[in-house]
Regions:
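Thiamine diphosphate
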Residues: 47-48, 99-247
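Conserved thiamine diphosphate
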Residues: 1-129, 200
Length: 247
């Protein structure tokens, strides 16, 4: 109702509630009518230890499948700060993941600029290209820094807009010869950024060596987050170990 009257409503809740419980309403009322509603949801992916009832590990897959809906996954406080006015200015429905609590700053606050629909190369590297979003961009940068000492040169391409995907930038970076391409995401391996990138590469007949760092296709455990991130392979140390095993 507010959107039809010319307002720009922002709705916020936990990601499990804003996607699973509200899915039909978002699909049939907001997206089908292309209403200017912004849905900002906290605790995406594995960012809570409360178990499957609170872990929105499939939210990107659900939201990517809805026509007209733009999907955003910022990586830190600066990204969120810049993304909010950008999605407010965008005409149409948006789903944005939110990191909760004290969110670190990992981007360059002087040189970074969020642009809707654009991926950003945060660092170059000749050996590995990590394509990531959200929390996993944070971890990818940490892993790249740690691997410098071992002689591995790791590039990080941050993809804050999951839909529409910045196909041109991804194809350009994935076309660099000799680099291992790794997609890292805080989401189930099915239906998220990894499958979107894999489909893009296949449709454009690009066949780099390709790996995926993602959550498994299962209901995840409850527990302390550091333990769960190690268990499911998305902690910095787990990412470093995976990259070393692939190089």
């Amino acid at each position: 109702g507010m959107a039809k009257e010319g307002f720009t409503p922002f709705a916020t809740t936990y990601a499990v509630f804003g996607t699973r419980r509200a899915y039909d309403f978002i699909h049939q009322v907001i997206a089908e009518e292309n209403l200017n509603v912004k849905i900002a949801c906290a605790l995406p992916g594995l960012t809570t230890g409360y178990g499957p009832s609170h872990q929105a590990t499939e939210d990107l897959a659900m939201m990517r499948g809805i026509p007209n809906l733009t999907v955003i996954d910022p990586c830190d406080a600066l990204d969120i700060e810049q993304a909010v006015p950008a999605i407010a200015a965008h005409r149409g429905p948006v789903y944005m993941r939110l990191l909760r609590g004290q969110v670190p700053l990992v981007l360059d606050e002087y040189n970074y600029k969020f642009e809707l629909g654009k991926a950003k190369l945060l660092r170059g590297g000749r050996d590995v290209l990590i394509i990531s979003s959200g929390l996993l961009t944070m971890r990818a940068l940490e892993a790249a820094k740690e691997l410098e000492g071992g002689g591995a040169d790791v590039a990080v391409l941050h993809v804050p807009t999951i839909k529409p995907l910045d196909e041109q930038t991804i194809l350009r970076e994935a076309s660099v010869p000799g680099r291992l391409v790794v997609v890292a995401e805080n989401h189930a391996a099915i239906g998220g950024l990894g499958e979107a990138v894999a489909s893009l590469l296949l449709r454009n007949r690009l066949a780099p060596e390709f790996r995926q760092i993602a959550l498994p296709d299962e209901f995840l455990d409850a527990g302390a987050l550091p333990t769960l991130h190690d268990r499911y392979g998305i902690s910095t140390s787990a990412i470093v170990a995976s990259l070393k095993s692939w190089l």
